[in-house]
Structures are given as structure tokens and as C-alpha cells.
From Swiss-Prot:
Homology family: Belongs to the small GTPase superfamily. Arf family.
A Pfam family per the record: Arf
Gene responsible for this protein: Arl5c
Keyword Thylakoid attached: no
Designated name of the protein: ADP-ribosylation factor-like protein 5C
GO molecular function, one term: GTPase activity
Keyword GTP-binding part of the UniProt annotation: yes
Keywords: GTP-binding, Lipoprotein, Myristate, Nucleotide-binding
Residues passing through the membrane, by range: none
Protein function: Binds and exchanges GTP and GDP.
Organism: Mus musculus (Mouse)
């Protein structure tokens, strides 16, 4: 009976899906969140703690938690994992020096029990910048092909123009309606 009600809610009603947006500092997490919300560039400063906004895409409601990415704040990310259905990992495609740190944080998250059923969307941000890493390069460095227990998708984007962001949201919406 509960499954029937859940299915009817997905078809006819709206169900809220918790999303956490993570990534190292200055990757573009907050810019992406507000690009989703307003379709405009919003001047941001470093997030201390979190920002929360609801994004609606065709009856699918996403409650998005944008978490600060500074080193001192990353240890608090796990307090937001409970009931998260999606993880959006934002990567600065120009920051080759910290990609190892990003990989470590990604696999630490994926190993967390509270995220065992989460789908992962990776935004390779700043694709508009010359010599930025491609999604293929990032995918290879992060060894994304080794991720077997989580549906995942990597999407190149530019947070400032919004390019690539709708495709990522559509992937999330498809994942939400498939479950």
C-alpha cells in the first residue's frame, strides 16, 4: 500500500528530494544553486555553514543544501547526509592541484552509510576557462568508472552562464522519477 501511495505521489503529486551540494571552496557551488533558482549570476561570498533553497522542475521538488567547502567545514558535511537522495559534487575544472583532495572527499562521502542510496551528479564547472580539464579527464582522474553502487553522471558546465546546468537537473529529475 505504501509503495502505491509513493508511486501515485510521483505521478500526480510532488515529492521533495533532498540534495546536498558539495565541493571544495571556490568551485562554484553557491553560484550554481542561485543559477538554478534565478537563472542569473548572483554575487556570492564564501559559504560559512549552508544555504538552502527549493528548486522545482516539472512537479519534482528538490530541497538543495549548499554546503561550505573550506577545509575546516568539510568535516561537518556528514551532518547533512541523512535522507539525502542526491549529491551534487561541484568541481573547479581549472584546479588541477586539488583534484586529489576532491577524489578523497568523494570516496569518503560514498562510503558513508547515510549516502548508500544516493545518486551522484558531478558538475565539472568553469568549462569556459581556457585549459580547463574536460569531463573525460576528470572522470578518469576520479576513477568514476569504479563507482558501482551509486548512479552517477558527470556534466560539464559554466555556472556563470548556466550552460550545462539544465542537463544536470534533467538527469536528477529522471533519477527521481525512476525511483
Amino acid at each position: 500500500m505504501g509503495q502505491l501511495i509513493a508511486k501515485l505521489m510521483r505521478i500526480f503529486g510532488s515529492q521533495e528530494h533532498k540534495v546536498i551540494i558539495v565541493g571544495l571552496d571556490n568551485a562554484g557551488k553557491t553560484t550554481i544553486l542561485y543559477q538554478f533558482l534565478t537563472n542569473e549570476v548572483v554575487h556570492t561570498c564564501s559559504t560559512i555553514g549552508s544555504n538552502v533553497e527549493e528548486i522545482v522542475l516539472r512537479k519534482t521538488h528538490f530541497l538543495m543544501w549548499d554546503l561550505g567547502g573550506q577545509e575546516a567545514l568539510r568535516s561537518t558535511w556528514d551532518t547533512y547526509y541523512s535522507n539525502a537522495e542526491f549529491v551534487i559534487l561541484v568541481i573547479d575544472s581549472t584546479d588541477r592541484n586539488r583534484l586529489l583532495t576532491t577524489r578523497e572527499e568523494l570516496y569518503k562521502m560514498l562510503a558513508h552509510e547515510a549516502l548508500q542510496n544516493a545518486s551522484v551528479l558531478i558538475f565539472a564547472n568553469k568549462q569556459d576557462v581556457k585549459d580547463s580539464m574536460t569531463t573525460a579527464e576528470i572522470s578518469q582522474f576520479l576513477t568514476l568508472s569504479a563507482i558501482k553502487d551509486h548512479p552517477w553522471h558527470i556534466q560539464g558546465c559554466c555556472a556563470l552562464t548556466g550552460e550545462g546546468l539544465p542537463a544536470g537537473l534533467q538527469w536528477m529529475q529522471a533519477q527521481a522519477t525512476a525511483n
